[in-house]
Each structure stands twice: as structure tokens, then as C-alpha cells.
Amino acid sequence: MFSNFDFSVIPPSLPYIWQGLVFSFRLTVTAMLGGIIIGTLLALARLSGGKALGFAAKTYVDLMRSVPLLMMILWFFLLAPFFMKITPETSALITFTLFQAAFYSEIMRAGIQSIPRGQINAGFAIGMSYWQTMGNVVLPQAFRNMVPVLLTQTFILFQDTSLVYAIGATDLLKAADNTGKLYGRTVEMYIFVSLIYFAICFSLSMFVKYMNKRIAIIR
Amino acid sequence: MIQIQNVSKWYGSFQVLTDCTTQVSKGEVVVVCGPSGSGKSTLIKCVNGLEPIEKGSIIVNGTKVNDPATDLPKLRSHVGMVFQHFELFPHMSIIQNLAIGQVKVLGRSQDEAHERGMKLLDRVGIKMHANKYPGELSGGQQQRVAIARALSMDPICMLFDEPTSALDPEMITEVLDVMVELAQEGMTMMVVTHEMGFARKVAHRVIFMDHGQIVEDAPKEEFFGKPHSDRAQQFLSKILNH
């Protein structure tokens, strides 16, 4: 069945696909870093005991997690132009960061709660403030405990970046789609990008295994 | 140094401490004992404000602990505390454990903090393990590090919350030795423990608690000679006759 395939379209389209891949990476890294930072703050807000703050954070997280990512991408792209001029790429960056923050916040909340109360008391007992204890004692341990889950979430995120196809942002999939249509060889290009997605995710997961061994806390 | 006046505390509707009054003077070593669930750990955690109290007052070195205006971190920075489960920071090396409070709270330089930390590690006999992580040390060694960490903040008094209860019997001695030495140097200490040998050796006073109340508060000789209350007599006869 492969006799009709023509993979010779791949080399000339590489530079364009590369650009798409770079955007996919940019989207993943931005959403991961932004998501972890905002997510950690959301988690702290929920655990702070402050009623209004905790409620606001919980509402945000619940709302984000109850709507499919694709809907969020579309809605934001359709509504944002009423408030600002925005490219599909910027729209995707913002949506992904806000959406991922909700998921990372749940991971961080579990991570923070996994740290025994005694550790917090120990931080307090040597005179650290709440924020010093969080920053030096709780969060570093919570992050280490949560690395496998945080990275798994990041794989899902990387794979989900292909959804920006819907709003025409040029990511890896869209770039492949465009060139495929240009040459009339869509199937070949889809096979090619699938292999790229696989190669990247597989090597990342190997890297995660290695990292887990290195940063695990000796107990 | 530490004044505890008519302190009561509730967890919901359950009263954990009832009208506790006692004090620890400068240079005094006070041992708090009693059956489990009697509130002794809760009481000692109230002293540095880790547990809030509902009634009464606690004054440490002239500062009222249960006053909302009190700068608790500042107060705690010079009240050392040692926990039952050591609570060393597992993601930091031993020397970092000793340096972090000095650097972040007291504002010392890294070099200064490390130098002071190494001196204290030497004193508790852990100097050679300075760059290891807490998980690589035995329980007794970890607890000695925890004592050194508390001392690194130059505390004016030390609180010990069952420091030997989580240790294997053979490691208890190495921790008690460090504590005895501290007591003999004149450190003000409040110690929750079942180690009556330690109490006999260095305590000035012994407090016996039961059901959240201070049942007996007497000089050591009197406490071990002839406790006033039946409950304390029972307790002593049970833990001493082996």
C-alpha cells in the first residue's frame, strides 16, 4: 500500500515544518512555565484558608477543568478581538497558559499537601515566616515529589498543542498540513509529523525517568 | 523566662488543655511527663505559638505569645525547638539544614553560617557527615543534627517535644548525652519526655500532666521521692518498676 506514497515531498518542506515545531515548543514551554507559576499561586490561594481568595481560585480551577480545551481555544480566539488586536499564535499562548494553570494548580495542591505538617512547623520553629517556609521548605519538596506528574501533564500539553490547528495558528501539525496540501501529499506529511511527535515524547519520557532518579529525595 | 498562665485550649468541643499554669526560670531544666494524650506535646507547642491557645496567656522572655501583635517568627527565632520526628529538611544537606535559618532569618552570610554550623556539628559529633543528606543518617544522628540546627539560631531557651520517642533504644543515649551536656551548661530547657533517667540526672523540676491538666509540679527530689497525687504515683510506679 506504500507504493503510491511519495515521501520526496518531505525534504523541501523541512524549513517550514521546523518553524511550526518551534512554535509548538514555544507554546509548550510558555504554557508550562506560566502554568506552573500561576498554578502554584492558585494552589497556595486555595490552601491559604482565606475564604474569598480560596473560593475565587477554586471557581477558576473548576471552570477551566470543566470546559474542553478546544472550546477554550476557540472561545478565546473569537472573543479576544473585541478587546485587543491578537494573532492566532498569541491567542493560543494565552489560552494554553491559563488553561494549564488550572491543571498544574491541582497537581501542586496535592504536592503541597503531601508535605507533612511537621516540616512546616520546623520551618516556623527556626523563625521563618509563612512565605519563607513555603519557598524554602514546602515548595522545593512539593516540586520534587510532583516532578513525574508535572512532566506527564507537560507531555499531554505538548500533544494538545496540535489543537491550535482549529484557529489557524501555525504549529507543527498546521505546518505539515499546509505543505501537505501544497504538494497534494497530506497523508505522507501526517505520517511524518506523527513520527516527530512520537520521537519527541518518547525521548522526553526517557529523560523524565533519568531525572526522577537524579532528583529523588533520599528518605 | 517562660510563664504559662491559666492556659486552656480546645480542639472543637474537645478540651485538650485545662487551666495550665507553670513557669520555667532562666537556666532551669523542666521535664514534662504524663501518659499519652495528656496534652504535654500540645502544651509545649503552645509555648512558641505553633498551636494557638483560646484562654490564658503565655509569656516568653517578656513577649506575650498569644498577642496578635507579636512578631511570632522573631520570637521563634530565639526559641529552639526539637521535634519527635526530627523534621530535618530532607532536600538539603546537613550543613544546609544548619545554615538556612541563620542565613534567611538572622541574616548571617553563608560563610559565617557554615562556620557556626560546622562548630555545632562537631559538638554533636556529626561533623564528618556535614555534606550528607538527612536520609543517609540514623535516627539518633538526625536528632543530634536537629538539636544542632536549633542551637545554630543561638536560642535563649530550648523546647524538646519527645526527642527520643521515635528512636531505637540504642540511639536514645547518644541524644540524651547531648541534652545532658546542654543542661549542664545552663541552657533553659523545657523537655517533654518519658526518660526518667534524664529527669533524675538534670531536671530541676518535673511536671506531671493528665487529661490536659497539670496534676503535679514539683522539684525533682520531691517528685521522685513522694508525689502528692495518686495519678502521678501510679504513673511512676508503672514506668519505674522495670
What feature does the model see in each segment?
Chain B
Residues 1-220:
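ABC family nucleotide-binding domain
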Residues 211, 221-242:
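C-terminal boundary and immediately downstream tail of ABC-type ATPase nucleotide-binding domains
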